[in-house]
Amino acid sequence: MLVFAVGGQEFALPLGGIVEIARARTPTPVPGAEPGVLGIVPFRGAMVTVIDGRLRLGLPGAPMGRAGSMIVLRDSGELVGLVVDAVARVALIHPAEREPLPAALRLARTDLFLGVVPRRDGGYLFLLDAGAVLRPAP
């Protein structure tokens, strides 16, 4: 899984749909785009829809132009870029390490999460469902 940081928290996505990790660039806004869609950027001869990872994960947005990375994913043949604060590492997560979301967590969109992996510091690594992250809230 690819581990990355957004808003001071660590999240992870399965490697399967990830095409590339690129430097975040300022996208061209698209009129009428859904909330959280920052715009589009050219990428290797194609256009990538750029999504604000903070807003999609229910965190306060940050202004574009900040240092960050864009995780480019393929979803149903389309390229989508998820802007994150930083990419940390690739981690092997054993199924036995995965736990359900703690009931005490108050999350706006539980559909985004496959579960959590408890960390030694008492926090959690949040495991994300890539397909759900790329779709707007129902």
Task: Tell where the protein language model's regions lie, with residue ranges.
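An acidic, low-aromatic, low-complexity terminal/linker signal
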Residues: 1-138
